[in-house]
Structure formats: C-alpha cells, structure tokens
Swiss-Prot record:
Its cofactor is Mg(2+). It catalyses: diphosphate + H2O = 2 phosphate + H(+). GO terms for molecular function: inorganic diphosphate phosphatase activity; magnesium ion binding. Mg(2+) 2 binds at D122. Diphosphate binds at R80. Its EC number is 3.6.1.1. It is found in: Cytoplasm. Keywords: Cytoplasm, Hydrolase, Magnesium, Metal-binding. GO terms for cellular component: cytoplasm. Mg(2+) 1 binds at D117, D122, D154. GO terms for biological process: phosphate-containing compound metabolic process. This is Inorganic pyrophosphatase. The gene is IPP1. Its main location: cytoplasm.
C-alpha cells in the first residue's frame, strides 16, 4: 500500500511556508496525483487535510505553484487567519479538499444558480481526531452544504474518517444529527458568520441552508470529478492558469516523470500576532 508523507519548506506562519505531499518518497501534486477514491467500490475517498480543527491559519492547496503544495492564503501580501467567532475557535472541523476534483468556474450549477469557485471540492471531516496539514485521510461521504460565497457556489462536503469510532454508525446525513446533535447547525452557523470579523457580510446558503444527503453529495462529487478530468486533459474552456503538472498521470499533457522540490525543513512556527486569539461576538449568531 502506498504511503503518503509530507515535506515542509519554510516556517509555519510565514510567506515561505509550503507543505508538499510525497508518495513513497516521490513528490506528487496534492491537486492532481492523489486518487479521489481509495477503494475500487468508490465508497471510501481520499481527503487532503489543509486546516486542522481548532487552528486559524487559512491553509489551502496552491493552484499556481508546481505540484500544488499547501500554502497559507494571503490578501494584499498579508497572511490570512480565520478569526475566532464565539463560541468557536478557528476552524470548526478538519478542513480540506478532495483531490482530482474541480469546482468549474465556467459552469453555472442549475440549482444554486452560481458558478464554481475554481477550487478543489471542500471537505469538512467531522471525526474526533485532529488532523495535520498535508495528511491524506480516508473518509466516507455523508452529505453536502451549498455555501454561496461572494456569488460563487462553494460546496462543503460533510465526511467522516473511516477510522473514527462513529464511522460505522453514520452513513447518511440524518445519522449525523442522531449521533452528533447540533453539529450541522453549528457548521451552518460557522460558515455563515466566519468572515464577519473581517468586515464582510455573512455568507448565504442555497437550499435555505439545508444539508443535502449522501446521494446528492455523491452527485456533486461526480460532477466535480468530471470537471477535473476535463481540466487535467487540457480541454477546459478556461483553466484559470492552474498548474497542471503531475508525476503519475502519464497520459496527460503536463505529466513529468521526475520533479524536484527543495529539501525538507523542520522549522519552528513564526510567532503570530496575539490579536488572532481574540474572540469575536457576532450579533445574531446562535449557540
């Protein structure tokens, strides 16, 4: 069985920080090389953890850099941190993405009436174990929320680590409310309010905030997988400048047999401003 490991460059909380993923010691693209499905039956999926639960740094798979390492997002040259919206601290779940998926910005979804956000499909992993940036988790899908983020469709797949003690008991979205009461309501609230401390309006949801079931989520995943297949084949009407370099997909135009990345470093995190620890109290937020 293949083993995925991470290689870190630079210090966390700096502009230089990058987390590459390697498979059996060989660099791979976090976006393109890791299979979406972890088993032949397509019931278990590979999720890449970008942001561990309860942390603030807005880490994401880079669309621009070769092999798509995980980096910290920036705005106007400054590192982005998610604020603490009471009673939450940082991200409410292990947050990440499904590889080999793409929310196509050239396509308007018929039900949300909004185009894709040009990113891999987002995943909220709701198990009890806190992950780490660059971790490849095996998860099963339970449902999906449709966030409308600044006019774009931004799907949020709800999933659980297959190794979680509850994994055998939760198989669809209604099981989440049964075994984890309040989690879906809190997830909806968090995504609705988390940008307010930065001066932005609250986010909106399609379907009146309803979390759709596993069947609907599987269809969203299939659509985003097909969009990625068009992208990696070089056939997208507009690839938005995404780096498509990969080291495993030999039949694609951007395959490279060998790719070099810098030597790994194990540097201590740079200090961050104490204001990141502040709690923000949002009027109208439910607890």
């Amino acid at each position: 069985m293949s083993t995925y490991t991470t290689r870190s460059i630079g210090a966390p909380n700096t502009l230089d920080y990058k987390v590459y993923i390697e498979k059996d010691g060989k660099p791979v693209s976090a976006f393109h090389d890791i299979p979406l499905y972890a088993n032949a039956e397509k019931t278990i999926l590979n999720m890449i953890v970008e942001v561990p639960r309860w942390t603030n740094a807005k880490m994401e798979i880079s669309k621009d850099l070769a092999l798509n390492p995980i980096i910290q997002d920036t705005k106007k040259g400054k590192l982005r941190f998610v604020r603490n919206c009471f009673p939450h601290h940082g991200y409410i779940h292990n947050y990440g993405a499904f590889p080999q998926t793409w929310e196509d910005p050239n396509h308007v979804h018929p039900e949300t009436k909004a185009k894709g956000d040009n990113d891999p499909l987002d995943v909220c992993e709701i198990g009890e174990t806190v992950g780490y940036t660059g971790q490849v988790k095996q998860v099963k899908v339970l449902g999906v929320m449709a966030l409308l983020d600044e006019g774009e469709t931004d799907w949020k797949i709800i999933a659980i680590d297959v190794k979680d003690p509850l994994a055998s008991k939760v198989n669809d979205i209604e099981d989440v409310e049964r075994h984890l009461p309040g989690l879906l309501r809190a997830t909806n609230e968090w995504f609705r309010i988390y940008k307010i401390p930065d001066g932005k309006p609250e986010n909106q949801f399609a379907f009146s905030g309803e979390c759709k079931n596993k069947k609907y989520a599987d269809e969203v995943i299939r659509e985003c997988e097909e969009a990625w297949e068009t992208l990696i084949a070089g056939k997208a009407s507009d690839d938005k400048g995404i780096s498509l370099e990969n080291t495993t997909l030999e039949n694609t135009p951007t395959f490279t047999a060998s790719a070099s990345i810098p030597e790994g470093q194990n540097l201590a995190p740079a200090p961050i401003d104490q204001s990141i620890d502040k709690w923000f109290y949002i009027s109208g937020a439910s607890v």
